[in-house]
Regions:
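Bacterial Sec-dependent N-terminal signal peptides
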Residues: 2-8, 14-45, 235-236
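Short, acidic Ser/Thr/Gly-rich low-complexity loop/linker segments typical of extracellular
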Residues: 63-79
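Short, ordered, surface-exposed loop/turn motifs in non-cytosolic proteins
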Residues: 43-67, 150-155
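Beta-strand-rich modules
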Residues: 200-224
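Extracellular fibronectin type III
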Residues: 222-235
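Structured interaction patches on ligand/partner-binding surfaces of diverse proteins
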Residues: 98-123
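Short Pro-Gly-centered beta-turn/loop motif in secreted/extracellular proteins
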Residues: 74-78, 83-93
Length: 236
């Protein structure tokens, strides 16, 4: 008799859980989408960012008028854009954090696909020029801090066999980093002599012999980036 009661209780609990699951399944899926760019307040162009991930730029949205106390956060891409297709329609405040000073938070009504750009000032802007000669690539740079009081601590010239490139381990294959305090500089990579090129030559060949270069500059404890430049190597 006791065993029968236990079985009945278990069956009842299972039925309750199944009913609750059915109720959850009846909720409509999110129909909203927010997308946009973190735009340089002066140039109007997207701010180049670190690789998308935990060490990159974060966009946070908070629903307004619902009593929500927890923001929903997601990562911006290294080209300065972002997109989140898993939100409900409604009113939101939008903020972002990264190697820039955000020019106030935004407020947007999400209705279907909704654009919401953010205005920001990076700590520095980086101009990069690349000249190629067969298997060699010469990268030159100019770093311009956005405030006269900002000092450039260190500058990096990076290359990678994937487009996702920044100063974090695993996000670059080779680098030239002895530009301490420099606002200008250049370096020539002879890729066929680079150890990581030799170690990853098959991957590079599968990707059309492409490698990617980028400049990073540390200023006020934050690292800003140039855009990523693609090189197609000619080893003939």
């Amino acid at each position: 008799m006791i065993m029968k009661k236990i079985i009945n209780i278990i069956l009842l609990a299972a039925a309750v859980l199944m009913a609750a699951g059915c109720e959850l399944d009846n909720y409509d899926a999110p129909q909203g989408c927010i997308y946009g760019s973190i735009l340089d307040a002066e140039t109007g162009k997207p701010v180049p960012l670190p690789v998308e991930g935990t060490t990159g730029a974060i966009v946070s949205i908070m629903e307004v008028g619902t009593g929500a106390t927890l923001a929903q956060s997601f990562y911006a891409k290294q080209d300065g854009t972002y997109r989140n297709s898993l939100i409900f329609e409604g009113d939101y405040t939008v903020t972002a954090s990264g190697p820039f000073i955000l020019q106030g938070s935004g407020q947007v009504t999400v209705n279907g696909e909704t654009r919401c750009d953010q205005s920001a000032v990076p700590y520095s802007r980086i101009e990069m020029n690349v000249a190629q000669d067969g298997m060699k690539g010469t990268v030159s740079f100019t770093v311009t801090p956005t405030d006269d009081s900002y000092k450039v601590k260190k500058t990096y010239i990076l290359w990678n066999y994937r487009k996702q490139t920044d100063i974090q381990n695993g996000n670059f294959a080779g680098s030239k980093t002895d530009f301490t305090g420099s606002k200008t500089g250049s370096h020539t990579f002879n890729f066929e002599n680079e150890v990581q090129y030799k170690n990853n030559v098959d991957k590079i060949a599968e990707n059309g012999n492409k490698v990617y270069v980028r400049v990073a500059a540390e200023c006020e404890g934050r690292v800003n980036y140039s855009e990523v430049y693609e090189l197609t190597l000619n080893n003939n």
